[in-house]
């Protein structure tokens, strides 16, 4: 968590890019990654936005970028069902509850002296750019709403 907080700070972006750009990590020039870390977006055709609020998130305001939301895990599992990687009868909630240890994250945050961090399990209903809605309490409805799925 401390590393995530460090990575989130703008004054550390250059050093972070130098570290992760090394051969043993990404093996890329710093210039290839520093802009994205800082929120610079190259839209092409000379249109570049610098310092946007679209910088990569590692921590967020109160840890929400790293918090293990069970609702997001439910979406990932649902997508795996969608594409045939998991069986259609997979018990999503049971699998999430067996594998997601948000309690350990919360305990770690407390040990680190962090306050105001997330404590619930869900970000709520998510609406995507295509208008589709994922309700973690009803993943089957999301699956039924999708026209594009695994082709048998």
Please give the residue ranges for each predicted region.
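Conserved C-terminal helix/tail region of periplasmic/extracytoplasmic solute-binding proteins
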Residues: 74-152
């Amino acid at each position: 968590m401390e590393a995530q907080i460090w990575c989130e700070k703008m004054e550390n972006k250059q050093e972070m890019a130098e570290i992760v750009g090394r051969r043993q990590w990404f093996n890329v020039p710093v210039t290839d990654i520093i802009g994205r870390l800082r929120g610079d977006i190259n839209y092409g055709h000379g249109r570049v936005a610098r310092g946007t609020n679209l910088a990569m998130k590692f921590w967020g305001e109160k840890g929400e970028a790293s918090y293990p939301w069970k609702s997001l895990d439910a979406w990932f599992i649902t997508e795996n069902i969608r594409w045939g990687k998991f069986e259609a009868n997979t018990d999503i909630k049971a699998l999430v509850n067996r594998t997601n240890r948000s309690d350990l994250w919360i305990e770690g945050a407390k040990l680190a002296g962090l306050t105001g961090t997330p404590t619930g399990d869900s970000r709520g209903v998510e609406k995507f750019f295509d208008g589709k809605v994922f309700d973690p309490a009803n993943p089957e409805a999301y699956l039924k709403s999708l026209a594009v799925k695994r082709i048998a």
